[in-house]
Amino acid sequence: MVKSVNEEGAETAYAYDENGNGYGGGNNDVATAIALGQRATQYGMKVCIDFHYSDFWADPKKQFVPKAWQGMNIEEKADALYNYTLDSLTQILEAGVNVGMVQIGNEINNGMSGETDVANVRKLLTAGSKAVRKAAADSGKDILVAVHYTNIDDMKKLDTLLTGLQVKEIDYDIVGLSFYPYWHGTMDDLKNAIIHIRDTYDKKVYVAENAYCYTAEDGDGTSNSVEGTGDLAEGYSASVQGQANEVRDVCAAANEAGAEGIFYWEGTWIPVGPADADNSAIWEKYGSGWA
């Protein structure tokens, strides 16, 4: 997979790292991140490390505190986050992974690692940023610090969050935006969001996540994220060609707006059917459908 996308022009691979004991749905620990990162580095690619700071992958609806950090106050949690980030990133760098960027949190519009108070989230971001800067300095590498948001359809809230980072002088380099047209708007909305953030906050921007379905059929006996024609983005069918058109248009829109690039997420997360009784029982435990 890595070799194939590199041959087609991909420059950066996206490896995410969940800490602690997972709930299923795939567990990307440090060892896995190293293995994937080494594979990408082998083909001349840079790697983006995405810290979710959770035992389960994080998004606006799920920002669970790791079980190992439960009961900590914000100062203790910030220290734990700093140490975890520094230790993990140091291991990854020492393993020879060509890290070009680190996301400190994943889709943090509504909170991060169990914290919903914006002041506490900023403390965690500061701790994560300091850890990345330390690891970068120790390794002699130039590594971008990224903050990752989604829901560009609510730019008012996104502006509030980014203004808070600016006022409190949070140290970061680049803003990542998730963009799925069936949830977040049109290509013009994406372009406008990128241009607005670049001009208003003087930060680089990239599309941290994008994907589109090539079929609306159920492949694993559980519900799909996007189901039926009513859920699809206008102008893009649930087909191989529709998927290709959407990805090309997102790339074009991002480039036109001055974005640094785009990550397709998640290109290998496909059903492995059939959805029989034996497989379904395993998927229910490990999350190979509902996650």
Where do the language-model regions lie?
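Short, glycine/acidic-rich beta->alpha junctions
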Residues: N28-T32, D189, G242-E246
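Hydrophobic faces of well-ordered beta-strands that scaffold small-molecule active sites
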Residues: M1-K3, V47-F51, G100-I104, V145-V147, ...
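Short acidic/His/Gly/Ser-rich catalytic and metal-binding motifs that mark active-site loops
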Residues: G9, D55-F64, N110-S113, Y214-G221, ...
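Glycoside hydrolase catalytic-domain groove-lining segments
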Residues: K134-L144, D159-D231, R248-E260
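Active-site cleft segment of glycoside hydrolase catalytic domains centered on the general acid/base Glu
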Residues: V30-A31, D59-Q166, I170-Y172, G185-I194, ...
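N-terminal substrate-binding region of glycoside hydrolase catalytic domains
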Residues: M1-Q42, K46, H52-A80, G176, ...
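Active-site beta-loop-alpha junctions enriched in small/polar residues
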Residues: V5, H52-F56, I104-N109, H148-D153, ...
